[in-house]
Amino acid sequence: MRPRITFRPLHGILLLDKPAGLSSNNALQAARRLLRAEKGGHTGSLDPLATGLLPLCFGEATKIAGLLLGSAKAYDAEIVLGVTTDTDDADGQPLRERSVPALSEAALQAALAPFIGRIQQQAPIYSALKQGGEPLYAKARRGEVIEAPVREVEVHAITLTSYASPRLRLRVTCGSGTYIRSLARDLGEVLGCGAHIAALRRVWVEPFRTPEMITLEALTALVESGADAAQLLLPVAAGLSDFAQITLDATLAARFRMGQRLRDPAFPEGQVAVFDADGSPAGLGLVDADGRLSPQRLFNGLNAAAAC
């Protein structure tokens, strides 16, 4: 019989290198058990096929998980031309095979160009987007006819890193909500041969541009060695580095923590991260054009290290 896990309050961000074949939620729960963290959340799903950076938020850090969900991201994608699948990736069932035309690098660059910028993109039918309160993938698995939603997404850059027919590799930098599977599918149609994702790796998520990731295997080994894996957590403040920052003295910080609005013409307008004078994160706020700071999310029980 397995010993019962005693969970504990733990605050911080773990930069997990998600393995292929595991859902984002299963990866989160595995890490949460290893850390013995009471509360955890992830910052946006990676497809089971995908590997790479999955920031996991624990404790008070879960209050900024939604902000990281909306951050810019970068992916390395391997695309196979000539075959379409029902999931738009290699995990799905083949639907159609077509011959791949002779393609020069210039032709590929020209085909990729319309996918850069703000574009309309139809989500895969096998996706976690909900329709009528139910994920699309659940409907697709039952064989229902689905019209996946078309949404505006932003692709900042696409770099063709290699091409050896029928495989090409891309580095894609994009905004929140972009499906690389959809990009591969649509590129295949532009080229007239169809395509699907063979491999996908997320390499960074703002603000973690050069992440030092840890695998579940390494995390397990660390725990089994008797070490406290909490040392791997980044402080909550690490997830706030892209925000304008306001530092308050003890009196004003106490008022802010009680939900009171503060006013100072010197406050930068927009969403801000608010810190105590000792460097501990107090919360997130919104400053209007008149310098009024309104609390949005308040952090509780964090010291200057903010990950303990």
Swiss-Prot record:
Keywords recorded for this protein, A-Z: Isomerase, tRNA processing
Active site: D47
Chain segments annotated as coiled-coil in the UniProt record: none
Domain of life, per lineage: Bacteria
Catalyzed chemical reaction(s): uridine(55) in tRNA = pseudouridine(55) in tRNA
Enzyme class: isomerase
HAMAP family per record: TruB_bact (MF_01080)
Protein name: tRNA pseudouridine synthase B
Function according to Swiss-Prot or TrEMBL: Responsible for synthesis of pseudouridine from uracil-55 in the psi GC loop of transfer RNAs.
InterPro entries reported for this sequence: PsdUridine_synth_cat_dom_sf (IPR020103), PsdUridine_synth_N (IPR002501), PUA-like_sf (IPR015947), PUA_sf (IPR036974), tRNA_psdUridine_synth_TruB (IPR014780), tRNA_sdUridine_synth_fam1_C (IPR015240), TruB_C (IPR032819)
EC number of the protein: 5.4.99.25
Biological process (GO), any one: tRNA modification
Family to which the UniProt record says this protein belongs: Belongs to the pseudouridine synthase TruB family. Type 1 subfamily.
GO molecular function terms attached to this record: pseudouridine synthase activity; RNA binding; tRNA pseudouridine(55) synthase activity
PANTHER family associated with the record: PSEUDOURIDYLATE SYNTHASE TRUB1, TRNA-PSEUDOURIDINE SYNTHASE
UniProt keyword DNA damage present: no
